[in-house]
Amino acid sequence: MSHVDNGFRSLTLKRFPETDDVNPLQAWEAADEYLLQQLDDTEISGPLLILNDAFGALSCALAEHTPYSIGDSYLSELATRENLRHNDIAESSVKFLDSTAAYPPAPGVVLIKVPKTLALLEQQLRALRQVVTPQTRIIAGAKARDIHTSTLELFEKVLGPTTTTLAWKKARLINCTFSKPELADAPQTLSWKLDGTDWTIHNHANVFSRTGLDIGARFFMQHLPENLEGEIVDLGCGNGVIGLTLLAKNPQASVVFVDESPMAVASSRLNVETNMPEALDRCEFMINNALSGVEPFRFNAVLCNPPFHQKHALTDNVAWEMFHHARRCLKINGELYIVANRHLDYFHKLKKIFGNCTTIATNNKFVVLKAVKTGRRR
């Protein structure tokens, strides 16, 4: 938890999930402050759009202007809602949209936190292109190291004339004026053939490893369980390739695809629809913070390729929460399978949570682990 006085209001903000007290991470950064310094209450007229507000620092500061918070992270929405409540600001002050929704027309101000992936930024800029006007003030911010020539060129290509500021506290801003430059259409998804199958895998803009199968998933797919029954979870499903393979290998089972990214869940649904439409009645698709709100003792197996970063920060907090949720929601003798980089040492973390852990396979970079829920002990 950290305090910030940004010129609009004094706030106490925390990350979601919360980090430990030993290695605390802030819920705001210099780029948030820098963006807010550019604004004056009197100049905000028309809809205010805020894109990729990771923990709600901008939305909370500007809540009196009833901003739209737009992004591809359910965790960010939960963080913003929690920080609004914590600062006694009505949750209804902020309207939440995911990146696939239509944006409000003719915004007066657009604030963008530059996302990690250029593909998501392009998708969002193309969506903005449909609604902004030459009078819309468009400002983007990020750590200086995360603003590249390619970032500026993308703003120029999609929206119009673009300039950048000097660095301040290692943050920089991008100012852009809409001039509607000529722009070729772009496909909504990027697609590729999955080796060894006749499947075409479709990927929306913010899906991890959207240009091809990542090497961790490739290794995991070589060691997926077969002959499972009941409900299986593809937790952190991404484009759904693991869940799709589970559907094929386990015809007696159903698969729940879960991710905090609406684009990931949309990609998973699309990939089942196009590659195994006959299996749709064995599928459920869920945008969620891991397995929050899901009843305990429900699933026979959970499979997970957990992230070890949140936005630009390295952290195992998301993975740790996934493991705890998996244990709670597994039936007795239910199994958790994960693939992870070897250096993360998840073996001992799983053993601490489940009381057991087995190495299924390993190579020079990755390890596949299995933990079994043996009883009600934590």
UniProtKB/Swiss-Prot annotation:
Q: Which reaction does it catalyse?
A: guanosine(1835) in 23S rRNA + S-adenosyl-L-methionine = N(2)-methylguanosine(1835) in 23S rRNA + S-adenosyl-L-homocysteine + H(+)
The record's annotation in Gene3D superfamilies points to: Vaccinia Virus protein VP39
UniProt similarity note: Belongs to the methyltransferase superfamily. RlmG family.
The answer to whether the entry has keyword Repeat is: no
Q: What is this protein called?
A: Ribosomal RNA large subunit methyltransferase G
Report keywords, A-Z: Cytoplasm, Methyltransferase, rRNA processing, S-adenosyl-L-methionine, Transferase
An annotated GO cellular component of this protein is:
cytoplasm
The task this protein performs is described as: Specifically methylates the guanine in position 1835 (m2G1835) of 23S rRNA.
Identify the EC number(s): 2.1.1.174
Kindly give the InterPro entries that the UniProt entry links to this protein.
DNA_methylase_N6_adenine_CS (IPR002052), rRNA_m2G-MeTrfase_RlmG (IPR017237), RsmC/RlmG (IPR046977), SAM-dependent_MTases_sf (IPR029063), Small_mtfrase_dom (IPR007848)
- Which Pfam families does its entry note? MTS
- Its domain of life? Bacteria
* Gene Ontology MF annotations: 23S rRNA (guanine(1835)-N(2))-methyltransferase activity; nucleic acid binding
Q: Main localization of the protein? A: cytoplasm
Enzyme type, top EC level: transferase
Q: What is the lineage of its organism?
A: Bacteria, Pseudomonadati, Pseudomonadota, Gammaproteobacteria, Enterobacterales
Where's it found, cell-wise? Cytoplasm
